[in-house]
Amino acid sequence: AAGRTNSEMSYNILREAIVQKLDIEKAIFENIARVAGNATTARKLGGLGAWLKTNTSFNTAGSGANPTGNIGGATPRTNGTQRALTQALFDDVMQKTWVSGGKPDAVYLSAFQMNKALSFSGNNNQRQTGAVGTVNNNMAIYMTPWGQVTWQPCRENRSRDLYIIEHDKLAIATLRPMKNEALAKTGDNEHRQIVSEQTLQVRSEASLGGVFDLTTS
């Protein structure tokens, strides 16, 4: 293609590596149970939704429930009837997380929930005059008595879920580093595969929080 300095193969390898990283990010934010795997079943990481149960808010009146059992990530949470995100719901989970010893520093949420958060009271800088001809409608940092968090809108985050995160208490563990491998040729056609395996490592579930069962429209 015009403007490419490398081969078409190199371009597609790079593109697929980027897509693979997005797939991993999406899996992290999913409500999926982990699978240990065996000779016939692929291993699967447990998403954040299947880990969090100490500091959560969900709709108990609408059949919502935390994951069960004592093994983190082993069972998915039960989705409940959805309700709108409110400041009270958010602040309640922030308080629970602080009481449990957490020091959250970031909030991951969808674009829809970010717009809901912009209406939180106390956001005095929500609308302020920027350069001539512009209006700033943004809230990057939210301060509470239980800590200061940075808002991180995330395309891969399930819109019905909001996660309150302490980054030091999460990690992406690499089981197999990303590797570009050549496969057998078919005539003049060259084939390659990009293989990697990562999993979500939760170092302290009690340092994290989540607001679940949120409306998405």
Language-model-detected regions and their locations in the chain:
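Core alpha/beta structural scaffold of self-assembling particle/tube/pore-forming proteins
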Residues: 1-217
